[in-house]
């Protein structure tokens, strides 16, 4: 409650290392800049920018809000202090150096100094690597106990649980 609906946008295929992966906050009737949302230029007039971005061409596949009962690091999940999301990053098959294959933590905080934030929606963000070299992770989910689960593409389809233990 308090943040709204979140969705990811992996950009267009065949754009090389452009554009960035996006985390967007859904707003009714909004335009999100596609296909003119180039990371080297300002958000096109009349559109809404992402509330967070990540390494281009790595595919943010799944995203989930960290529940308040989770022992994993994160914010309080309220409009005053901010929210923490976790996302699986599948990785790129189309780069010289491997990228992705990780889980990232996304802290969404109220924009400071009465600014509109990076998206124009009143939020700022910080994205950090949480777990690396996790294979090619499929969408992740938190369970009712606050533990984080993910599976990987290929191999044996093992389901992994991430806790603080």
PLM features per residue range, with description:
Residues 1-127:
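Beta-propeller domain segments
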Residues 34, 130, 162:
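Hydrophobic residues at beta-strand termini and immediately following loops
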Residues 56, 132-134:
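Conserved loop/turn at the beginning of each blade in beta-propeller domains
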Residues 107-110, 134, 141-144:
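Short leucine-rich amphipathic alpha-helical surface patches
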Residues 126, 137-139:
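Short glycine-rich, acidic/polar surface loops and turns
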Residues 139-165:
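Blade-level signature of beta-propeller repeat domains, shared across WD40, Kelch, NHL, RCC1
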